[in-house]
Swiss-Prot record:
Protein name per the record: DNA protection during starvation protein
Function description: Protects DNA from oxidative damage by sequestering intracellular Fe(2+) ion and storing it in the form of Fe(3+) oxyhydroxide mineral. It binds and incorporates Fe(2+) ion. Effectively inhibits hydroxyl radical formation by the Fenton reaction and is essential for colony formation in the presence of air. Is also able to bind zinc ion. Does not bind DNA.
Homology family: Belongs to the Dps family.
Pfam families membership: Ferritin
């Protein structure tokens, strides 16, 4: 683990597991469920950008937000189903997503530029990439190759999305 965000997520997962009886894959269940909450919030944030963006680039970026939402929801479904497969219970209500996600939502406004929206999405995807790194670390520890593969695919897509968003902003990749 190399950055503070990743370390904080890992510490939070460990704290959740210490409260429970350890059955051998509790950390994996905890990080999968954290991903359920965070992916749900991330999809909501992208949806807000989709609705509230205005300006140059709208015609290209509006459908791109649909693609991002579809990808997030695909990861959400796969991660939730994996959690169920290994004996977990995914968060499934807006209240649970809100209480457990580390992503913050704000009320949509028309006064943000497309650049502001894209910078926010870079932050969201950077957080998700860090979360997926925790998932990789935890699933390595608990020897769960299937969940590890899921986190690898999700992190690969998150990092590609960061690169694409940063390129649209005229920035070099900051991974």
């Amino acid at each position: 683990m190399t950055n503070t965000i990743t370390e904080n997520i890992y510490a939070s997962i460990i704290h959740q597991v210490e409260k429970k009886e350890n059955s051998g894959n509790e950390k994996t269940k905890a990080v999968l469920n954290q991903a359920v909450a965070d992916l749900s919030k991330a999809a909501s944030i992208v949806h807000q950008v989709h609705w509230y963006m205005r300006g140059s680039g709208f015609l290209y970026l509006h459908p791109k937000m649909d693609e991002l939402m579809d990808a997030l929801n695909g990861h959400l479904d796969e991660i939730s189903e994996r959690l169920i497969t290994i004996g977990g219970a995914p968060f499934s209500t807006l209240k649970e997503f809100d209480e457990n996600s580390r992503l913050e939502e704000t009320v949509g406004t028309w006064d943000k530029s497309i650049t502001d929206h894209l910078k926010r999405l870079v932050q969201v995807y950077d957080y998700l990439s860090s979360l997926y790194q925790v998932g990789l670390d935890v699933t390595d520890e608990e020897d769960d190759a299937v969940s590890n593969d899921i986190f690898t695919a999700a992190q690969t897509e998150a990092q590609k999305t960061i690169w694409m968003l940063q390129a649209e902003l005229g920035q070099a990749p900051g991974l």
